[in-house]
């Protein structure tokens, strides 16, 4: 019996939709590049995660534009943004929100925490106690929060960008494997190159780096982004590439050089990321190179 590969692994994407998507993504990347010097790889990976409906763990020292990248991206895609700084004394209610009695109405009002946004920047996630981390990871996994018997669901556009300092720094703790598995990708933001740093200095010297985010106009609306994101479901993946992903995962589980093999969740993450990354490159089909590229970041998140 002949199998319909399009039905199994993706449908044909109309060229008009693909062209519109490519134009929007190129404009988005261009606008980010006009504000942030370098970090093109990081920008591609963050956009890939958003398109794949996943979360990102970003490791890097302070001062490499992690916060600016998150705020700017949210602004350009017309998304609600929030930020929470994780500290050793942070409580779950500081992240999720809390119920407060309103004496005027004689009722309890729920005050939403920072997790109720579209793009959430969680700074220094590896400085918070385990209980607070667990509250966040439950929301990441379930995309909903249960507070005082009421369940609050997150919107369709929901990506957490969590940053962590290198574990060698004082007061940091290595995240457990089960928690790393909640991230689609792990990215390391490097220092700028010499030429990039000179460019940064020139921008600051001439005040060209002074950008008011509130004055920046979105490139795309949330509704448009969600509509275009559905194109990832139509990206074609040949059966041989599915076998390729499965083979990679199997080999990590038998190799003595790997501490903990890739889980099935990691295999799915690799597939989702590869489809989104292919679309970001203007293609409606996945290549082996897409998988090899995404492997560097999806496997690191799941099996660090």
What residue spans do the PLM features occupy?
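Conserved ASCE P-loop NTPase core motifs with emphasis on AAA+ ATPases
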Residues: 2, 6-31
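Pre-Walker A (pre-P-loop) alpha-helix and adjacent loop at the N terminus of AAA/AAA+ ATPase modules
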Residues: 22-55
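Walker A/P-loop
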Residues: 52-86
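Conserved alpha-helical scaffold flanking the Walker A/P-loop in AAA+ ATPase domains
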Residues: 102-120
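Conserved AAA+/SF3 P-loop NTPase catalytic/coupling segment centered on the Walker-B
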Residues: 117-140, 173-177, 194-198
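Canonical AAA+ ATPase core
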Residues: 142-219, 227-232, 275-277
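AAA+ ATPase "lid" subdomain C-terminal helix
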Residues: 250-257, 269-286, 299
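Conserved small/polar residues in nucleotide/adenosyl-binding loops
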Residues: 297-304
């Amino acid at each position: 019996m002949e199998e319909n590969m399009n039905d199994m692994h993706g449908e044909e994407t109309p060229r008009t939709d693909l062209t519109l998507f490519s134009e929007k993504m190129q404009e988005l990347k261009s606008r980010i590049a006009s504000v942030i010097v370098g970090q093109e790889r990081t920008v591609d990976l963050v956009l890939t995660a958003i398109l794949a409906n996943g979360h990102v763990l970003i490791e890097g020292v302070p001062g490499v534009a992690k916060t600016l990248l998150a705020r700017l991206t949210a602004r350009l895609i017309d998304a609600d943004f929030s930020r929470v700084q994780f500290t050793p004394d942070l409580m779950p209610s500081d992240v999720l929100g809390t119920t407060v009695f309103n004496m005027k109405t004689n009722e309890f009002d729920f005050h939403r925490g920072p997790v109720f946004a579209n793009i959430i920047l969680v700074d220094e996630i590896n400085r918070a106690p385990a209980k607070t981390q667990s509250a966040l990871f439950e929301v990441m996994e379930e995309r909903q929060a249960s507070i005082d018997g009421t369940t609050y669901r997150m919107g369709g556009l929901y990506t957490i960008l969590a940053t962590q300092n290198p574990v060698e720094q004082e007061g940091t703790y290595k995240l457990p494997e089960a928690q790393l598995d909640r991230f689609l990708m792990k990215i390391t933001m490097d220092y700028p190159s010499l030429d990039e740093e000179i460019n940064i200095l020139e921008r600051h010297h001439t005040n060209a780096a002074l950008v008011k985010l509130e004055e920046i106009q979105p490139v795309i609306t949330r509704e448009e982004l969600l509509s275009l994101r559905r194109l990832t479901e139509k990206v074609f993946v040949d059966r041989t590439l599915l076998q390729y992903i499965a083979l990679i995962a199997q080999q990590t589980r038998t190799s003595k050089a790997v501490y903990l093999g890739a889980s099935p969740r990691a295999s799915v993450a690799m597939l989702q990321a590869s489809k989104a990354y292919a679309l970001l490159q203007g293609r409606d089909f996945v290549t082996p190179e897409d998988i090899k590229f995404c492997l560097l970041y999806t496997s690191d998140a799941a099996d660090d």
